């Protein structure tokens, strides 16, 4: 996962970390990042394909009220690289999602 690189400078989604995103330690729960990333893809994608592999590299923590911006590169052949930044600059996590035919 550390080799995941995202070149895109255009955000595909922006959201603010809410109460339901926060774990008992006051951080955004790691599962919520995965859910936000999976929400980037249209429902049709899930009807036609399945996720073969999902890699995640956590880099930093984020907290209630942080603005999370998601960037995505389509690497081709069903491979997507995603990066989440908080408050416009610091990378929180990177992910590689690989889809395959059902």
What residue spans do the PLM features occupy?
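HotDog/MaoC-like acyl-thioester-processing domains
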Residues: 1, 62-64, 73-102
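Hot-dog-fold acyl-thioester-processing enzymes
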Residues: 1-50
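Well-ordered beta-strand positions in beta-sheet-rich domains
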Residues: 12-14, 53, 94-96
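A conserved acidic, glycine/proline-rich C-terminal tail/linker
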Residues: 44-81
